[in-house]
From Swiss-Prot:
Molecular chaperone. Has ATPase activity. One of its GO terms (cellular component) is cytoplasm. GO terms for molecular function: ATP binding; ATP hydrolysis activity; ATP-dependent protein folding chaperone; unfolded protein binding. Residues 362-578 are annotated as: B. It comes from Colwellia psychrerythraea (strain 34H / ATCC BAA-681) (Vibrio psychroerythus). Belongs to the heat shock protein 90 family. It is found in: Cytoplasm. It holds the Pfam family HSP90. This is Chaperone protein HtpG. The keyword Coiled coil does not apply. SUPFAM superfamilies: ATPase domain of HSP90 chaperone/DNA topoisomerase II/histidine kinase, HSP90 C-terminal domain, Ribosomal protein S5 domain 2-like.
Length: 653
């Protein structure tokens, strides 16, 4: 290797420098994982070369024996991880080693809590990989050359992990990457072969690429003639000379792709470690399923559900998906075609015998084999979650708290599995009036009142707004359970999930209320009498609110509040209008239905008001109060306050 030249200084982005320092301190308690990360990256580089070489065999440069090598130098307190994989050119070095995360750093920082344990978990999900080297090293040197480039196109990258790094062009005869860790003084344990071997065996047995370490050198032994000790009369036999045995590179891992082994031969610990390899998550998975499918379409799948959600889970544009292998040859990361977007949290891999080795993302898009595998994997994940929900409610609740909002995308995206996805959903409800979303649609149906044929729900901006909605009053009075929905996605969900198990989902804020057999004859008779009594008042209110409401009705849903607004059956709900407006969509103008409570003292007072101006003022205040309760804001709050003040003053005279 020639001397480095053309040294250039670079700075990490400010957010990346912060992450680097935070990571070094937060992960210190489990620092040995740095070696797992570096070996995993080296194995990935070998996999990527194997794939590229399918179409260009010259990339092997007459060396097709792919491996990772781990070595140390006690005297200089260094540790080196080398691979003969794909390597990098200077642009790739700056892109991959100069940027800890290409996007999402602001969102990442917003989720940090200051608690070391939880922040450590989050950092693990962030996927720091290579940068974990700085946990034990005060300087890292990377020397790399991309396969196919000339020996003079090597690159050297050096950083002390303090916010900046240098790059220089070097000569590198062998392709691939060497990472040299200049260990901190108190981290010399990682310059010990036995310690390194124990870590590699612990974390990297499942990697299909051979991880090699040097054996100890055995010195030569000279020949010895037969000697008799006359004093003790003991004869020592002659011994031939033994040649020195040089240090040799030998595999220290099994180097067998874990997913190709029989399930019965794989321990839970091995499955957990393999999850960390494919996901770069530092925590254990919640669930996993390992299956070999034979028949018309043959493939092996190993699917994991994480315990914790990644910080950028709600970014639907971010690449997600499974690692794809064809006939055990790595093809690509993030093959999103095999898993629907609402299951983007699922990690793992697929190994297919029915796809071509030169498969591309474009070929995968409309491939019958892809569709069959996607269908099978989706059902497998849903079945895995269903089983967990039935078997361990507490564990499932933990899953729901992490991934529930993403799962709610399912009914809109996956029509074929809509009913099964709906069975996995959980909601808060008036059954407990708790913010905890632990009510399934099946358990709601089990508690339905005699004569009830609908699943009732309310959607609001917050749990408190949903729980205290005036639309719930008659339901609380009759003991009818209502689902309380306040997640941003809930309105979108119920627009696609209209029934479950033959029961229609019905919004309590939409259309006319018909409780059917749950209303007794006496209640219906009293309602009809009240409607006749208020017929002229309703007409007078409608005239007062001309152009602002579609209709005025005597309410059947109010018991404590004077008035409320509801959406007509065919109109957009308030929550859907807000959702569309928040993403810049044009929202059509629709008029609400205004319902009044004929038994309420305020409504009776308004009904008796003979002065037209005062009547109109009262009607406006009741209407704006109802709008405020339903939508959370008014177009002209100043006029509302002025009217309210005027009416309160009139009551003091």
């Amino acid at each position: 290797m020639s001397e480095t030249n053309q040294v250039q200084n670079h700075a990490f982005a400010s957010d990346n420098a912060k992450i680097l320092q935070l990571m070094i301190h937060s992960l210190y308690s489990n620092k040995e994982i740095f070696l797992r990360e570096l070996v995993s990256n080296a194995a990935d580089a070998a996999d990527k070369l194997r794939f590229k070489a399918l179409s260009d065999n010259t990339l092997y440069e007459n060396d097709g024996d792919l491996r990772v090598r781990v070595s140390c130098d006690k005297e200089n307190n260094t540790l080196t991880i080398s691979d003969n994989g794909i390597g990098m050119n200077v642009d790739e070095v700056i892109e991959h080693l100069g940027t800890i995360a290409k996007s999402g750093t602001a969102e990442f920082f917003s989720q940090l809590s200051g608690d070391q344990a939880s922040d450590s978990q989050l950092i693990g999900q962030f996927g720091v990989g290579f940068y974990s080297a700085f946990i034990v090293a005060d300087k890292v040197t990377v020397r790399t050359r991309k396969a196919g480039d000339s020996a003079t196109d090597g690159v050297e990258w050096i950083s002390a992990g303090e916010g900046e790094f240098t790059t220089a062009k070097i000569e590198k005869t062998n392709r691939g990457t060497d990472i040299i860790l200049h260990l901190k003084e108190d981290e010399s344990e990682y310059a010990d072969d036995w310690r390194l071997k124990s870590i590699v065996t612990k974390y990297s047995d499942h990697i299909s690429v051979s991880v090699e370490m040097l054996t100890a050198e055995v010195p030569a032994v000279e020949a010895v003639a037969e000697v008799t000790d006359e004093k003790d009369n003991v004869t020592r036999p002659a011994a031939d000379a033994v040649d020195a045995i040089p240090a040799l590179w030998e595999p220290v891992n099994k180097a067998t792709a874990l997913w190709t082994r029989e399930k019965a031969d794989i321990t839970d610990e091995e499955y957990k470690e393999f999850y960390k390899h494919v996901s770069h998550d530092f925590g254990d998975p919640l669930l996993w399923e390992h299956n070999r499918v034979e028949g018309k379409t043959e493939y092996t799948s190993l699917l994991y559900v994480p315990t914790k959600a990644p910080f950028d889970m709600y970014n639907r544009e971010k690449q997600h998906g499974l690692k794809l292998f064809v006939q055990r040859v790595f093809i690509m990361d993030d093959a999103e075609q095999f898993m629907p977007t609402y299951l983007r949290f699922v990690k793992g891999l697929l190994d297919s015998n029915d796809l071509p080795l030169n498969v591309s993302r474009e070929i995968l898009q409309d491939n019958k084999v892809t569709q069959a595998i996607r269908k099978g994997c989706t059902k497998r994940v849903l079945k895995m979650l269903e089983k967990l929900g039935n078997k361990d409610a507490d564990k499932y609740q933990g899953f729901w708290d992490e991934f529930g909002q993403v799962l709610k995308e399912g009914p809109a995206e996956d029509h074929a599995n809509k009913e099964q996805v709906a069975g996995l959903l959980r909601f808060a409800s008036t059954h407990e009036d708790s913010t905890t979303q632990n009510v399934s649609l099946a358990s709601y149906i089990e508690r339905m009142k005699e004569g009830q044929d609908k699943i009732y729900f309310v959607v609001a901006d917050s749990f408190e707004a949903a729980k205290n909605s005036p639309h719930l009053e008659v339901f609380r009075k009759k003991g009818i359970e209502v689902l309380l929905m306040s997640d941003r996605i809930d309105e979108w969900l119920v627009s696609h999930l209209t029934e479950f198990d033959g029961k229609q989902l019905q919004s309590v804020t939409r259309g006319g209320l018909d409780l059917g057999d749950m209303d007794d004859a006496e209640t219906k008779e009293a309602q009809e009498k009240l409607e006749k009594e208020y017929d002229s008042v309703v007409k007078r209110i409608k005239a007062s609110l001309d152009g602002k409401v579609k209709e005025v009705k005597l309410s059947q849903r109010l018991t404590d509040s004077p008035a409320c607004i509801v959406a007509d059956d065919d109109d957009m709900s308030s929550q859907m209008a807000k959702l569309m407006a928040s993403v810049g969509q044009e929202v059509p103008d629709t008029l609400p239905i205004f319902e009044i409570n004929g038994e309420h003292a305020l409504v009776k007072h308004v009904a008796d008001e003979q002065d037209d101006d005062m009547f109109n003022q009262w009607v406006e205040v009741l209407f704006e109060q109802a709008m405020l309760a339903e939508r959370g804001s008014l177009k002209d709050p100043a006029s509302f306050v002025s009217r309210l003040n005027k009416l309160m003053l009139s009551l003091t005279k």
